[in-house]
Amino acid sequence: MTEKHTLRLADPSAIDSIISVDEFLQIKEQYDAEQPLITLQTKFNLAWALVRSDSTQHVQQGLSLFCSIYKDSPERRLECLYYIALSHYKLKQYEESRRYLNMLLSKDPNSPEALKLKNRLYDAVTKEGYIGMVVVAGAVVSVAALVGWASKRLFSKRRP
């Protein structure tokens, strides 16, 4: 029997779209208006808005809010695991993203959004690995060229 998926999560590609200033301000105004008793949904909305910002500091603040919701609201834990993983993904903290994503998939292995994020995560790690290999190869070639140049100068000065 296949388990039915019930969580409603944003597609991982939503993290690529930067939130508009107007939308962010509207959510922030709602958050500020509810002070000091902010509803869980408003807190969640602000966290998601912050994560969709192009500011690393905002993404980190959104991540912190999602972690707070995770701790304080057991009924939203699975959902928060996804958004925490997505936040770490956006920050290029791939190991942390994988850790939270695996926690979610252990509880909800059929989550289509989590499975898409897992694929994106794999692609990002693979791409980063290739870039790392190119950088290392470039450094090796540079060092070899420098050693060759230094050796040539050293040996050409010794000849009578």
Curated annotation (Swiss-Prot):
GO cellular component: cytoplasm; cytoplasmic side of mitochondrial outer membrane; mitochondrial outer membrane; peroxisomal membrane
Signal peptide: none
Membrane protein topology class: Single-pass membrane protein
Subcellular location: Mitochondrion outer membrane
Family per record: Belongs to the FIS1 family.
Function per UniProt: Has a role in mitochondrial fission. Has a role in outer membrane fission but not matrix separation.
PANTHER family, A to Z: MITOCHONDRIAL FISSION 1 PROTEIN (PTHR13247:SF0), TETRATRICOPEPTIDE REPEAT PROTEIN 11 TPR REPEAT PROTEIN 11 (PTHR13247)
Identification of the protein by name: Mitochondrial fission 1 protein
Source taxonomy: Eukaryota, Fungi, Dikarya, Ascomycota, Taphrinomycotina
